[in-house]
Amino acid sequence: MMSMLGGLQRYFRVILLLLLALTLLLLAGFLHSDLELDTPLFGGQAEGPPVTNIMFLKTHKTASSTVLNILYRFAETHNLSVALPAGSRVHLGYPWLFLARYVEGVGSQQRFNIMCNHLRFNLPQVQKVMPNDTFYFSILRNPVFQLESSFIYYKTYAPAFRGAPSLDAFLASPRTFYNDSRHLRNVYAKNNMWFDFGFDPNAQCEEGYVRARIAEVERRFRLVLIAEHLDESLVLLRRRLRWALDDVVAFRLNSRSARSVARLSPETRERARSWCALDWRLYEHFNRTLWAQLRAELGPRRLRGEVERLRARRRELASLCLQDGGALKNHTQIRDPRLRPYQSGKADILGYNLRPGLDNQTLGVCQRLVMPELQYMARLYALQFPEKPLKNIPFLGA
């Protein structure tokens, strides 16, 4: 009888051990399945201090103002120096090739942490301003929609656009309106992103030349964001820079109302790709590169989780900061003149109203999130160079 009881006890112990092992296996599988979502962003890579020496090539009409706001905020909250335009300038010498003397306060030993204002890339001169360990990145947009945006925004500035009644008309016969000899005023009218990288926008789209220039960009720029996939791009940027989530959360800035966006026919889109063939090759290449990097470093499941975290935090901040659920406002509806964006050409540039009654600390956070780039540049200039006259933003007095 005793031996039978002993046998039963051993039997139940074995069963309990098997159940315990099965439970542990199931738990391990559950934890592994959630690892992509719950692991901190920097899991699987060497951790370290946040990157603070950064050069962002701010291309035109590519969501770059939103990225600029991210960098300005990081610089201000971390007490970093910014390479700001000298004197009364609002850009770093654009459309001429960048020279170090376009930066306020530059000297033989002076180096800055962050450079992100509009310039035409010129590496030897940039290296006179930025440290050797600088992280270089930029952003591109589908050239069809980048050109459409430029046509509206620079309609009254670029000679090629002034004479064209519509983008359809311009692209139907671009040489009627575009003159190579006036390209410094017409930089927005053909291969503008290619131009911003320091290349010739009127060069022939020959395979060897294009590949050599793209390789040149790849050697210098460690990341190229894509405007159509901005949230995914910001997730990867955050990973590369080792920043906190709030550092890369941003609201859309310098965006247009829907009524000022032209609908383009398939024929017009194809003409735009052909006219801006160099931009198209650049965009195609780095769009593929971005997704290859995302797959390699994050994987689809983890990427979805990180993008949702970013969007959820943006919604939280919008609820905290913005009136009317964060609806974009026409500039005439923005109560605080310091938050009104600059209006250009035929574009209707939108902005935000902040919720009333915010405490001072929250108000400061929210103001930085929605501050247009010219006002923010003037703010940083005053903080960085208190002994110099304030930057003048003329349209604020209008």
From Swiss-Prot:
Residues 1-10 are cytoplasmic. Optimum pH is 6.0-6.5. The lineage of its organism: Eukaryota, Metazoa, Chordata, Craniata, Vertebrata. Belongs to the galactose-3-O-sulfotransferase family. Residues 32-398 are lumenal. It comes from the Eukaryota. Pfam families: Gal-3-0_sulfotr (PF06990). Glycans are attached at residues 79, 132, 179, 287, 330, 360. It comes from Homo sapiens (Human). This is Galactose-3-O-sulfotransferase 2. It is a single-pass type II membrane protein.
